[in-house]
From Swiss-Prot:
Tissues where this protein is expressed: Expressed in siliques.
Source species, domain of life: Eukaryota
Annotated coiled-coil segments of the chain: 117-201
Pfam families: Homeodomain, START
GO biological process: cell differentiation; cotyledon development
Keyword DNA-binding tagged: yes
Bias (Polar residues) ranges: 46-64
Protein name according to UniProt: Homeobox-leucine zipper protein HDG3
Assembly with partners or alone: Interacts with AIL7/PLT7, ANT, BBM and AIL1.
Ranges of Low complexity composition bias in the record: 11-40
Length: 725
């Protein structure tokens, strides 16, 4: 009988409560209760004792009295069944119900009350024990299932190559060989299908293989050839979207890369140390190996590591920066001096709301230093964008060329990207991490120091370009234009200033496009030890360019002067006649200038000859500078069309331009707080040599262009002679 059926009752001297134990008292050898020194009202009874209790046997006057026990009454089976039936209907009886029940069962109302309390407690305990048991069983089941899945992941095999699918469980070389083996096996199967078809036609039996339908060819992508070849060195192989077996691995890589980027962008020393320029941070490779022991792929032998970090305030909101990074046309335009070509091959994940949160896409890009002497870098990677919190975004790249058998590039992007945090007044705090491995054993001549120290593609180069481009965009969107007045100036309306800024922006965009996307014959001339790249473009039905054959000639050279000195000299209109052959020795005058950046040297200018009667041409000049690179770009424009555009409301996109100019870089020898190094200049001319849609290039045109560029280089070198001790 459970304890809930036994209720303690205080003994008030009522002998009716002792009737059940009369037999027990008689079996005590006729012992008188008074001889035990106990009052009959204090006699204890045990309702559980059904035997002839011998506990009072031998009790004498000289023996200490026993301790009192609580007295229990055992309810009858009828009472218990009645109360349980009532309990099922009403577990919480009120006072009236308890009194009625006590009268019916011959029990005290207090006994009824205690019984129901005990019954509720008993049921509650039983329910809790049952729930705990169920939860314990479920927990054990989940643990077993988790362990089973872990073992399954660890032992899973790639259906394509037969190798392990877990990242980091095998070396890069082993994984690449397995994929190559799977590709060769697939080719054998496809050849066997072809052989079977031939066998049916000729009647000659061939050895049979499992028949496999050849896959549909994916959309092709062809890497453009960079200057003097490219670091990719894969003979223009094509790639397409990743197959279904590779996508889970790509997603796992992207998620792991995002976790690594968040650490790299927020942890300071000892992971990051002082960089080459005193502001950027350089990666401590030993600490990196300790922090990321498993790593996302092994370090490749013969590859050189470049890793840096930079932080800056940018005049753009986080969502604007994210949109610019996730759309390849905006990305390549924003970083036109770094990204030569870019393409999105496939979007694996996309946000339904269209705000790029969670977007994951496969991309390829060609990175460049604007010089015919420097090979380009090609990369095939996945880009992943994720919002990390309110006003906080992260965008990360990681190379995936090792997962695809038909790509063999020599530039791998380890987790690289940026952390974008929203600030006040439409600004964003951008922390940029650039981490690549490159096999660039080739010679760079005068660019060797800049390239090998990692400065050419460092994080501060990306951030500096981003800051400068956002300043330019803000100036175009603003209606409060800052202009400079001079003694020989023209008055421009806001529409005229906007048109002039748009023309300057077109000059910059066309200059970079001419350096990157020109196709056709490429000639390298070694006259006077200078390599000159001459490329041809054909202009047809382009309202912003003259129709015919356009030559783009470019070369690079070194000057023994700091970049700021060279930039300030070349941008000044009063110095232009010293180096510009087209000026014919005549002075140029600045008649308008509109600032498009915080630095007043970032501006668009309008220049013209001192004697306007001798020339009907003007020059629109775009000057731009940041701590890593400077540009002086310009284009001759017709005075009449320019006057219509600035004052008559003409469309600036229809002003015919052929940009030329200079890209100025540090030579990589300068020290922070110490001696400044020299400058590396790339000069590029775009010229119309044959007009008309059916025009063809002539040898004399190439010779004239080469002579023009050499003359300009010689004049500039004479203005900055080498200082000897």
């Amino acid at each position: 009988m459970s304890q809930s059926n036994m209720v303690p009752v205080a003994n008030n001297g009522d002998n009716n409560n002792d009737n059940e134990n009369n037999n027990n008292n008689n079996n005590n050898g006729g012992t008188d209760n008074t001889n035990a020194g106990n009052d009959s009202g204090d006699q204890d009874f045990d309702s559980g004792n059904t035997s002839s209790g011998n506990h009072g046997e031998g009790l004498g006057n000289n023996q200490a009295p026993r301790h009192k026990k609580k007295k229990y009454n055992r309810h009858t089976q009828l009472q218990i069944s009645e109360m349980e039936a009532f309990f099922r209907e009403c577990p919480h009886p009120d006072d009236k119900q308890r009194y009625d029940l006590s009268a019916q069962l011959g029990l005290d109302p207090v006994q009824i009350k205690f019984w129901f309390q005990n019954k509720r407690t008993q049921n509650k305990n039983q329910q809790e024990r049952f729930e705990n048991s169920e939860l314990r069983n479920l927990n054990n089941h989940l643990r077993s299932e988790n362990q089973r899945l872990r073992e399954a992941i660890h032992q899973a095999l790639c259906p394509k190559c037969g190798g392990q699918t877990a990242i980091g469980e095998m070396t890069f070389e082993e994984h690449h060989l397995r994929i190559l083996n799977a590709r060769l096996t697939e080719e054998i199967k496809q050849l066997s299908v072809t052989a079977e078809k031939i066998s049916r036609l000729t009647g000659i039996p061939v050895r049979s293989h499992p028949r496999v339908s050849p896959p549909n060819p994916p959309p092709n992508f062809e890497f453009g050839m960079g200057s003097k070849g490219n670091v990719g060195n894969h003979s223009r192989e094509t790639t397409g979207p990743a197959d279904a077996n590779t996508k889970p691995i790509i997603m796992e890589l992207a998620f792991g890369a995002m976790e690594e980027l968040l650490v790299m962008a927020q942890v300071a020393e000892p992971l990051w140390m002082g960089g080459f320029n005193g502001t950027s941070l350089a990666l401590n490779l030993d600490e990196y190996e300790k922090t990321f022991r498993t790593g996302l792929g092994p370090r490749l032998g013969g590859f050189r590591t470049e890793a840096s970090r930079e932080t800056a305030l940018v005049a753009m909101c986080p969502t604007g920066i994210v949109e610019m990074l996730m759309q390849e046309n905006l990305w390549s335009t924003m970083f036109a001096g770094i990204v030569g070509r870019a393409r999105t091959h496939e979007q694996i994940m996309a946000d339904a709301a269209g705000n790029f949160n969670g977007n994951l896409q496969i991309m390829s890009a060609e990175y460049q230093v604007l010089s015919p002497l420097v090979t380009t870098r090609e990369s095939y990677f996945v880009r992943y964008c994720k919002q990390q919190g309110e006003g906080l975004w992260a965008v990360v790249d990681i190379s995936i060329d090792h997962l695809l058998p038909n790509i063999n590039l020599k530039c791998r992007r380890r987790p690289s990207g940026c952390l974008i945090q929203e600030m006040h007044s439409g600004y964003s705090k951008v922390t940029w991490v650039e981490h690549v491995e490159v096999d660039d054993a080739g010679s760079y001549s005068i660019f060797e120091k800049l390239i090998c120290t990692g400065q050419a593609f460092a994080a501060n180069r990306w951030v500096g370009t981003l800051v400068r481009q956002c300043e330019r965009i803000s100036s175009i969107l603003s209606t409060d234009f800052q202009s400079v007045d001079s003694g020989d100036h023209i008055t421009l309306t806001n529409h005229g200033k906007m048109s002039m800024l748009k023309i300057a922006e077109r000059i910059a965009r066309t200059f970079f496009a001419g350096m990157t996307n020109a196709t056709g014959s490429t000639i390298f001339s070694g006259v006077e030890g200078e390599d000159i790249r001459v490329m041809t473009m054909k202009s047809v039905n382009d309202p912003g360019k003259p129709p015919g054959v356009i030559i783009c000639a470019a070369t690079s050279f070194w000057l023994p002067a700091p970049p700021n000195t060279v930039f300030d000299f070349l941008r000044e209109a009063t110095h232009r006649h010293n180096w510009d052959v087209l000026c014919n020795g005549e002075m140029m005058h600045k008649i308008a200038e509109i600032t498009n950046g915080i630095d007043k040297r970032n501006c668009a200018s309008l220049l013209r000859h001192g004697h306007t009667s001798k020339s009907k041409m003007m020059i629109v000049q775009e000057t731009s500078t940041d701590p890593t690179a400077s540009f002086v770009l310009y284009a001759p424009v017709d005075m009449t069309s320019m006057d219509i555009t600035l004052h008559g409301g003409g469309d600036p996109d229809f002003v015919v331009i052929l940009p030329s100019g200079f890209a100025i870089f540090p030579d990589g020898t300068g020290k922070p707080g110490g001696k400044e190094g020299g400058s590396l200049l790339t000069i590029s001319f775009q010229m119309l040599v044959e007009s008309g849609p059916e025009a063809r290039l002539s040898v004399s045109s190439v010779a004239t262009t080469e002579n023009l560029i050499r003359t300009t280089v010689r004049r500039i070198k004479d203005l900055f002679p080498c200082q000897t001790a």
